Amino acid sequence: MPNNPVSLIRKKRDGVSLSADEIRWLIREYTADRLPDYQMSAFLMAAYLNGLDAVEAAALCEAMLHSGVVLDLSDIPGVKVDKHSTGGVGDKLSLILAPVAAACGVPVPMISGRGLGHSGGTLDKLESIPGFNVNLDLDRYRRVLRAHNLVLIGQTDDIAPADKRMYALRDVTATVECIPLIAASIMSKKLAEGIDALVLDVKVGSGAFMKTTEQALELARTLVSIGEAAGKRTVAYLTNMDQPLGYEIGNWNEVREALDVLGGGGPEDVRELSLLLAGTMVWLGGKAGSVEEGIALGRAAIDDGSARQVFIDVAAAQDADVTVLRHPDRYPTGGVSVDVVATDAGVVRGFDSYALGMAAVELGAGRLRTDDRIDPVAGITLTSKIGDRVAKGAVLATVRTATRTAEVAERIAETVRAAIRLGPGSQNPPKWVTHVVNRDGTFLY
């Protein structure tokens, strides 16, 4: 009996699981414009209310994946490995871990996104480097990857077009916050890259889209389940986003901090998390016998300068003016800067990371509308982490913008002040990593 969209929507509405073939049929009909938006919207709401089981989520991902181009990188030697982050504040880890893994011999075909809401995007950070071209055709994409073990580009319209259309529907039908739909959306785009393995950084906390450990674990398990069902080794880590990563928020700010780490310095949290994720990529890529060995190899690639050189070489291959990567102090800056000063002494008890991310967007580091232009120098430089003691009159942060007035910068500085919570006594810093999820289960880290 042929499939009927109304009967499939009714089944999902009533909490009945659909078969993989039924899911594939729905997506195929929708992609071919034989299923209207109103029926897909009804299906999405039914899925939101009743959930999708592992078979349904994997089938949805597979159907969206094959709605467009799936890259075949089998002619590129080695195990291709990528990393995906669910988004946070000050998250510049991709700029570090990708060249580290590449320097260790692992091909990294990284397709990244732009900023989303309060969360910064890797593409916007890369484009703060003058001339960096994230829009390469497939032939050049392969050439750069083959030459340097790394390529850094943006998503194209050819990759998972069904997901793009369905995401737009979810955005206007209040069905975004559905973990199986989120997971299928993420994995359909990642698997289209032609990778063999994937490392996932699932953020949890005030600056993450997942606010609780329970939500983050459910997402991590679903992502790993989909990846493994597709035959890709997949490992997820739950990492803390109750405070920004490092001290820099903004596009060029974060590139500069990533260069500090690639140069052997930089903040400890950024360095160690980058090495954990890169070390896992090196292990999955077959260049190390364990994650620990992969971390050691990654650390050596930073120490000997090879990881930093890979980043510079890839930037040059993608048309960037690498002068500012070799000499970050030559980057053109200007505009307005305002210091945020502590009105009382105390200990940093916490941050409203979401508010800090949105403050950076208001300064010009992100988009309030889709046609907004990014200000590459806009951002926030913090001076402390949770648990640090701060003196009265000390600078808590500096806000910078080249496209906003001094009055706007002063107002945003007050938002930043309110987002840094000071108090008496002492405060233990949060653990950077709490859990690891892989095909064998969920484990405390």
Predicted regions mapped to residue ranges:
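Acidic, glycine/proline-rich low-complexity segments that act as flexible tails and inter-domain linkers
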Residues: 1-90, 310-317, 321, 432, ...
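Active-site-proximal beta-alpha loop/turn segments in soluble metabolic enzymes
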Residues: 44-48, 125, 163-172, 201-210, ...
